[in-house]
């Protein structure tokens, strides 16, 4: 049984109630308060609690005025390693414990508040990694310490981790998972069990200490022969000494939809291995469409529970926050992607279909907009740790600030100011949005504003932004390209200005990127990618309305095509 732990922090009110007297209280589908918030009466305190299932426990002890208190769970040889939350200094810890009674012993904790909760597995995927949009900055350990580590207990890695960082995370009681692919998945002929086993057996999860499990990507549609080979290799892996006591995670689709995949799923369940169910939900055209996509997720999960009773206790539901080029579920610039993420988290943690869910994950940091990555951590905290049932984000699903973001209706709601006759038009190109990175494939975004620079004077398009909240920060995003030289590896200059608002240039950038290797259209492929430029400008509203001005900024004769003009509330670091 793992008895180590990590700590993070959040402000807690001081309550004059002995911590050990509180009764467990279910907060939502994934969080249960085992010991209520209360002040420690003496210098030493013993807190008894019962973990309702094998899994993660969150311990919070407030912000100390002096030295950190010493905390030990059960008969552990070492004390918990606290982590002070970067925003408020409160001490928190997470530890993976078996179901049943436990005891927390605190020394030097007088007047500190104590709060103990059962929480889900909260996973971050992947570290180390770097974003495809380099302007976001590195997702390095310093970034993780500030924005990610306080709110997760599991990190998925697919590459070498700095030894000191690896050891620190293990000391804190949290968990590393090592990623591996699934041999034979892309081949028509099944692999041999020996081939599959040999590949998994050389993974660091077997050859190096400290990992909690192996997460294999991915169990989807395949033949009976494939599943027979994978099942045999999986069984042999569990018999391997280096894998003893570790967990096999199956990244998967609907494993109940074929007899052979369902049979393998039953074996995984009997062994208490875990499923990581992929639910990468694209934005809907409106809120009703978005809710229907979440409802389909609910109905599919009901099928899981029908075929594998109790599977919710072995399920990590993997959402997708692919929200930036070159592959993005944020494909509708008229919708607020952060509102949609909040809708998904709210459903997982409050809808009865997901009651008892073991864990939650977002896939994956490489493709995540940096702002959305930070925002998702706030959702993990709000729902999975604090156990809230009220929505975190009450903004409307459809963004009210700008209309006709993809120029699908020509210049409706826009005012075009061409520098010369015929130098500004709306055009379309089949596959344009797919090459941009919108996923899954859609015709939305195949229309765009086209400009051709004429002499020294720029072309301009303008739109009045509406329903802004004075003092609130917003981003303007756009994606541009040179339609005459789409394969040219260069940035397309585009100037974005918001008149009547305070521009915040420290958050703005333009970054050229190639189309995703799997997004092929016409002559463009992984070997001959199309090139686009992702633009972001950020402003603080001074009034309920402002004027958005976009102009081309290239050399005379240069062509620029752009769309995906999204104006959305911005989450500042």
Task: Identify the residue ranges that each predicted region occupies.
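Short carbohydrate-recognition loop motifs
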Residues: 29-38, 431-457
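Extracellular carbohydrate recognition and processing domains
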Residues: 36-41, 76-96, 501-545, 555
């Amino acid at each position: 049984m793992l008895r180590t732990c990590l700590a993070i922090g959040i402000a807690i009110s001081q309550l004059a109630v002995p911590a050990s007297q509180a009764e467990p209280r279910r907060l939502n589908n994934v969080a249960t308060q085992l010991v209520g918030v209360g002040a420690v009466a003496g210098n030493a305190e013993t807190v008894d609690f019962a973990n309702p299932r094998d899994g993660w426990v969150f311990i919070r002890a407030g912000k100390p005025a002096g030295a950190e208190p010493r905390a030990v769970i059960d008969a552990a040889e070492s004390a918990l390693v606290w982590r002070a939350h970067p925003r408020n200094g409160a001490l928190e810890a997470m530890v993976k414990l078996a179901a049943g009674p436990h005891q927390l012993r605190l020394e030097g904790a007088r007047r500190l508040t104590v709060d103990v909760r059962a929480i889900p597995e909260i996973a971050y995927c992947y570290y180390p990694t770097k974003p495809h949009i380099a302007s976001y900055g590195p997702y390095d350990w310093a970034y993780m310490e500030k924005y990610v580590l306080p709110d997760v207990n599991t990190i998925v890695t697919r590459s070498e981790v700095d030894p000191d960082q690896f050891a620190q995370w293990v000391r804190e009681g949290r968990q590393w998972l090592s990623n591996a692919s699934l041999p034979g998945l892309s081949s028509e002929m099944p692999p041999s069990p020996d081939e599959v086993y040999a590949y998994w057996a050389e993974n660091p999860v077997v050859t190096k200490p400290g990992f909690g499990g192996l997460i294999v990507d991915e169990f989807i549609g395949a033949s009976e022969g494939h599943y027979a080979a994978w099942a045999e290799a999986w069984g042999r892996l569990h018999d391997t000494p280096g894998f003893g006591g570790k967990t096999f995670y199956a990244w998967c689709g609907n494993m109940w939809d074929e007899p052979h995949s369902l049979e393998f799923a039953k074996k995984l369940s009997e062994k208490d291995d875990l499923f990581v169910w992929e639910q990468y939900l694209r934005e809907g055209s409106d809120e009703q469409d978005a809710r229907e996509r979440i409802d389909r997720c609910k109905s599919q999960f009901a099928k899981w529970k029908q075929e594998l009773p109790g599977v919710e206790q072995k399920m990590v539901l993997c959402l997708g926050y692919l929200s930036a080029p070159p592959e993005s579920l944020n494909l509708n610039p008229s919708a607020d992607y952060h509102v949609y993420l909040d809708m998904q988290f709210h459903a997982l943690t409050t809808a009865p279909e997901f009651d008892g869910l073991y864990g939650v994950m977002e896939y994956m940091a490489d493709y995540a907009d940096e702002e959305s990555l930070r925002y998702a951590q706030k959702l993990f905290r709000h729902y999975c740790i604090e156990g809230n049932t009220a929505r975190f984000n009450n903004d409307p699903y459809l963004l009210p600030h700008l209309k006709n973001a993809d120029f699908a209706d020509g210049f409706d709601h826009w005012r075009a100011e061409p520098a010369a006759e015929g130098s500004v038009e709306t055009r379309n190109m089949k596959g344009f949005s797919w090459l941009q990175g919108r996923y899954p494939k859609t015709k939305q975004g195949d229309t765009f504003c086209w400009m051709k620079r004429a002499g020294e004077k720029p072309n301009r398009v303008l739109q009045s932004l509406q329903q802004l909240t004075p003092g609130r920060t917003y981003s303007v995003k756009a994606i541009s390209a040179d339609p005459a030289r789409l394969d040219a590896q260069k940035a397309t200059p585009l100037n974005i200005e918001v008149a009547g608002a305070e521009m915040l240039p420290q958050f703005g950038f333009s970054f050229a990127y190639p189309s995703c290797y799997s997004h092929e259209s016409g002559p463009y492929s992984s070997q001959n990618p199309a090139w686009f430029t992702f633009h972001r400008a950020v402003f603080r509203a001074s009034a309920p309305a402002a004027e958005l001005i976009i102009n081309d900024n290239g050399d005379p004769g240069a062509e620029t095509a752009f769309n995906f003009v999204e104006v959305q509330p911005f989450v500042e670091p």
